[in-house]
């Protein structure tokens, strides 16, 4: 599913797809390069599988190295101020497992709290995730194509500034109802 989502946006003009594992197979992250990329974009999306209620390890390494005091946060750190930040994730469990009475005890939103706190510290605008759940049950090819198409539609809407940001604040997932959050031109 993650490959299909990435492929759905790879060819979009005005959108940068940046694969950390491809760029840094040795985990030696070029901090200056990554900071430049962040400065050049208004929307930052972490697209990943939701491993053990978190991001893959390279994303944690990226956060630890790239979001430096004085650049991303602190009294002088304003490089990310006002930028939009969210996760596009896939998870094995379905929506019923990500509830207080479910197998995972917490909602996806609650499990993403450390990233929301990071966004807040960096003065970024946090948005709910684009979430594809139930991956462990297997997804039919048609459903994979549908989710990938929705992801492309949403990323395109962000690029074209067609997202109604007021309407997304209270939604659990950006893709809960794309028709309600994408303004018609």
Each model region followed by its residue ranges:
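Short, solvent-exposed amphipathic alpha-helices that sit
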Residues: 1-11, 107-122
């Amino acid at each position: 599913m993650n490959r299909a989502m990435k492929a759905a946006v790879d060819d979009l003009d005005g959108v940068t797809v940046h694969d950390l594992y491809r760029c840094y197979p040795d985990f030696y992250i070029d901090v200056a390069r990554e900071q430049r990329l962040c400065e050049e974009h208004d929307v930052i999306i972490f697209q990943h599988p939701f491993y053990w209620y978190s991001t893959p390890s390279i994303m944690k390494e990226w956060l630890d190295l790239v979001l430096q005091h004085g650049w991303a946060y602190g009294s002088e750190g304003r490089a990310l101020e006002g930028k939009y930040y969210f996760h596009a994730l896939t998870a094995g469990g379905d929506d019923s497992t990500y509830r207080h009475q479910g197998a995972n005890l917490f909602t996806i939103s609650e499990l993403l709290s450390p990233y929301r706190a990071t966004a807040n510290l960096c003065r970024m605008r946090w948005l709910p995730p684009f979430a594809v759940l139930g991956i462990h049950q297997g997804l039919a090819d048609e459903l994979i194509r549908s989710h990938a198409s929705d992801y492309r539609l949403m990323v395109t809407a962000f690029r074209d500034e067609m997202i109604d940001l007021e309407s997304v604040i209270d939604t659990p997932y950006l893709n809960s109802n794309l028709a309600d959050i994408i303004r018609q031109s």
